[in-house]
Amino acid sequence: MLNDHDRIFTNIYGMHDRSLKGAMARGHWDGTAAILGNGRDWIIEQVKASGLRGRGGAGFPTGLKWSFMPKQSDGRPSFLVINADESEPGTCKDREIMRHDPHTLIEGALIAGFAMGARAAYIYIRGEYVREKEALQAAIDECYEAGLIGKNACRSDYDFDVYLHHGAGAYICGEETALLESLEGKKGMPRMKPPFPAGSGLYGCPTTVNNVESIAVVPTILRRGGAWFAGIGRPNNTGVKLFAMSGHVNTPCVVEEAMSISMKELIEKHGGGVRGGWKNLKAVIPGGASCPVIPAHLCEDAIMDYDGMREKQSSFGTACLIVMDQQTDIIKAIARLSKFFKHESCGQCTPCREGTSWMWRVMERLVTGEAEVEEIDMLFSVTKQVEGHTICALGDAAAWPIQGLIRHYREEIEDRIKARKTGRMGAMAAE
């Protein structure tokens, strides 16, 4: 359990004043000018020492990512882009930061931008996040009026602007290069890499793309020291993290907890337990819709961090759990996710464009039991042909949930096919 004095987000539930005055009263924007005065190299070294990894799902070391930006300008401006396009089913943590604690993000953007020599930050917010956009824009306006950003930000002789861009609802724009394309006014389709954004990103200029939570935790890390953050959790999985729980828990929520907390403790302590008790648990998707499902017997000792989820043949992702009880039709649940990825594919890569549609059609047949048993292996084979063969990771995201389903629930799939053939499906439906 995380100690209260180690918490970074002081208003995640919106119980306090989210204005600049309220944020300052809770300790935000405290000594920001002094932090900037320590210089770019000090900031990046502290972030590296903290062990902070990207909170958007990939888990790339944040300090290392910042260090890829050019130290000296070649005449092109540098930019920080904040990915607030939180569009994956089950993921709902960043919206709480933007809606209730927006000043953590803006202060973090200023410090991160300074560390990378960026001229401005662009916050790309999900199209459906209307109230979040209003709260964030109001906070940005407050900071401009107070002189915290803009010309001579925080009286540091550093000019830094923050722009808020409202997306149009495309999931694919959550991929960093598709996001950059969208910001430039083009169709949101991922770019080939290299060149990477740090070399040629927004408008062909050096750019770093970070998740909302990754940026929002930076000011507190620098105030308390990288060693403090590194002392929470376990090696390679350090710090505090926002976890979300939805589905069949008694109290769905977003909560700030220490990394490496056990899944069972997280669900029992903060989610109010599984609906009907822990024995009624069927499966958990641990980090948003793109992560392979984990069956109940593996959830008993599952550790919620990058390494812990890898050991369970899944992924930590965004740490937003989707909990499913024994009454869940797991095949139908994964088929619904398959439909989402099919719908959101941009169509640029053939394996993803054709593969997601094909996988969804087979999944629909598995739901009704109309498929043949041989199609299970064929479906798994197709997921492997899609995985790793696309420009971006949407192909992987579409393949992994299906792989997890077949890996752990093959017997249930086969039983449904046999039930259809023997007429048991009609009897089951009647019950």
From Swiss-Prot:
- Record keywords, A-Z: 4Fe-4S, Flavoprotein, FMN, Iron, Iron-sulfur, Metal-binding, NAD, Quinone, Translocase, Ubiquinone
| Residues binding [4Fe-4S] cluster | 346, 349, 352, 392
Q: Can you quote the record's cofactor note?
A: Binds 1 FMN.
Cofactor dependence is on:
FMN; [4Fe-4S] cluster
As for family, the record states: Belongs to the complex I 51 kDa subunit family.
Q: What does this protein do?
A: NDH-1 shuttles electrons from NADH, via FMN and iron-sulfur (Fe-S) centers, to quinones in the respiratory chain. The immediate electron acceptor for the enzyme in this species is believed to be ubiquinone. Couples the redox reaction to proton translocation (for every two electrons transferred, four hydrogen ions are translocated across the cytoplasmic membrane), and thus conserves the redox energy in a proton gradient.
Q: What is this protein called?
A: NADH-quinone oxidoreductase subunit F
